[in-house]
Amino acid sequence: MRFTKALILFLIVFSGFSTIAAQDDEVIKVDSSIVRLNVGVVDAKGRPVTHLNKENFTVYEDGVKQDILSFAPTVTPFSVVMILDMSGSTLGFRETIRQSAFRFVDALAPEDRVAVIEFYDKVNLRNDFTTDRKRIANSIVAANGRGKTQLYKALDVALAKLSNEGKRRKAIIVLTDGVDTSARDIDRNFLEKYKGAEITTALKPETSEILNSILNKSDAKGVTIYPLALPTGDPFKLADPTPMQIAMFAAARNRLQILADRTGGTLNTINRLEEMGRLYAAVAADVRALYTVEYQPTNAKRDGKWREIKIEVSNPELISKTRQGYFAK
């Protein structure tokens, strides 16, 4: 068991080192030259700071200062997609999921528009964007299913729906164990070529075409993604796992981390089911504390290269967070 835990930790840490290197081979197609950033700001104690204005922010792309074209304060409404994992792995705690989802919706502002998507063997839009809290609650209650995990298909549907929300600020909250069926099958087929210790380093989660397709679209639309990772996807909780199972589950969890990091969101890990409601409420608070900044890059070349983004606030004691960058294509 001690060896198993060490192996899992190695896989999780190792994959993090190679994320940006692999991204150099990936190209993002941005629909517009305008770059949109959702930006969170906290103080030294981690408390959200919501009283800033445009003059408090400075944006850099590849170290070059950029002119901010537009600025939206934290009170500006959001369009939020709530994605619920209704695959077979969540059958034992559906009521906990529903009650936790209610807490998330209750913590949003009345003007925020919410769409609800469920996924299992299928991906279903339970309700389109609405401010009608009763309709949203009915969708959460009705969410159901079993079978496979179509996580990335659900994310693709969510991004397509957000495309119709115009200039509204956009976010996705996705509850899942991260073990997408299609991605897992691809990983398994790939790992079958390796044996023994080779399995532990062969799989590079950041090279997944399924993942990078979602990252391309989310970057182009300025969408922030907040995964809530269920304990059923934790490689530490597998019973007597094989090296291949450990590798696949660790890759699935790392892909959730990449989704959050690349889009400026946060991966919240649910270690115990009773934590779910609190974490949902915390994510809602994070969303409500986001500013939105837009700029047009001074480097107009669409050469497919990675553009690193850095955003600073005028008070050096405050900490800002946004997406890491984009590929200029």
Question: What would you call each of these model-derived segments?
Answer:
Residues 5, 20-21:
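Residue-level detector of intrinsically disordered, flexible termini
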